[in-house]
Amino acid sequence: MRNSWVASRKGKTNVSQMHFARKGEITEEMRYVAKRENLPESLVMEEVARGRMIIPANINHINLEPMAIGIASTCKVNANIGASPNASDISEELKKLDLAVKYGADTLMDLSTGGVNLDEVRTEIINASPIPIGTVPVYQALESVHGSISRLNEDDFLHIIEKHCQQGVDYQTIHAGLLIEHLPKVKGRITGIVSRGGGILAQWMLYHYKQNPLFTRFDDICEIFKRYDCTFSLGDSLRPGCLHDASDEAQLAELKTLGELTRRAWKHDVQVMVEGPGHVPMDQIEFNVRKQMEECSEAPFYVLGPLVTDISPGYDHISSAIGAAMAGWYGTAMLCYVTPKEHLGLPNPEDVREGLIAYKIAAHAADVARHRSGARDRDDELSKARKEFDWNKQFELSLDPEKAKQYHDETLPEEIFKKAEFCSMCGPNHCPMNTKITDEDLDQLNDQIQSKGAAELTPVKLNKEN
């Protein structure tokens, strides 16, 4: 779809959506997004120019269907997949991609750390994906030197970053906000540093006693990104890994640096979103969202969860979806899903489905709460189908039609029950929506209440007996 769109841009020094928007040009990607979001094209251009909206769309990801992340658009959901040294199979990762797209993931991150050829699995995923793909390049940087922090140099990081751009990665998590002076602030935490990328860079800084190379070479990374229209996802290396560590000095010190880096990237006309926690008590979620907006000049916020309790292994997709819904309500632009396997192991395809559905619920709840245009239309349509006992339409409008039908059919599998005016919960005689009270009955009752008062009502026969 995008071949003709990007053909004229190749070879230019800056091909980012922000660059065109700031010149007053509405790109085909912006027009496409405007239609998807039901927004004016001019508003999309203005929001991208301002930095409040991003359209992650690498010029080398030709089969991409452009989408927007920002407070003016619907709340988005990211799904994570990726092979590890202990569990690796490219076909399994492609199956996870298919499931993620099927169940409505808006973006997807390939977090592969080993066990497969990382370039090969990334290329396969990008070629198969209609949604934006994100990566964490420091993983491959470490893998390229066989896990040796001592052999890892600044150029290794930049080489891998550009390779990911060349392959068509739409956004990259760049952990540039973690500074060497932040590391002592981690003392006193229960879980310390829980970001894998942050952990790699912390080890690198402590070994070499040098500043974070992603910070010192940040302008070089901007120069790379603008040639491909790759978007920054500024990583939160010091995100809290438990409730105890939430909103502490270390987290907020890094957030301040992330705000400074956001504005530096914007000077290059490079798109930015900012990553956030993590594990956060419910009463601190609003503070975290507001603080990010303040420090990062309203760049789109992209949060992992947050989990609102630490005692839910096996059910962390539920704990975190609670926090995610709240974060989305307060203005977070994209929610990174958590699966039931969080903290326990590598997710399988079924875990991907469970996590994604939980987060689609959270994102949709946020859209409804923020009164986004058309957000409740599907809810109202399903409610009408429920009132009319149109079971097939209820299944169709569900976030997970297959599961809705499966649960209904466990007790009433015969096709005749798809037209029944009851389910197995209430049976045919006790369903309150099955009572034959008509609008005419209610109008007649209201007339009597208005004329006589409730205490003096005369019994009337319903127009239709129950």
UniProtKB/Swiss-Prot annotation:
Annotated positions binding substrate: N80, M109, Y139, H175, S195, R196, G197, D236, S237, L238, R239, E275, Y302
Gene it is expressed from: thiC
Catalytic activity: 5-amino-1-(5-phospho-beta-D-ribosyl)imidazole + S-adenosyl-L-methionine = 4-amino-2-methyl-5-(phosphooxymethyl)pyrimidine + CO + 5'-deoxyadenosine + formate + L-methionine + 3 H(+)
GO CC annotation, single: cytosol
Cofactor binding note: Binds 1 [4Fe-4S] cluster per subunit. The cluster is coordinated with 3 cysteines and an exchangeable S-adenosyl-L-methionine.
Organism of provenance: Prochlorococcus marinus (strain NATL1A)
Gene Ontology MF terms: 4 iron, 4 sulfur cluster binding; carbon-carbon lyase activity; zinc ion binding
Pfam families for this protein: ThiC_Rad_SAM
Enzyme Commission code: 4.1.99.17
Name of the protein: Phosphomethylpyrimidine synthase
Requisite cofactors: [4Fe-4S] cluster
HAMAP family per the UniProt record, alphabetical: ThiC
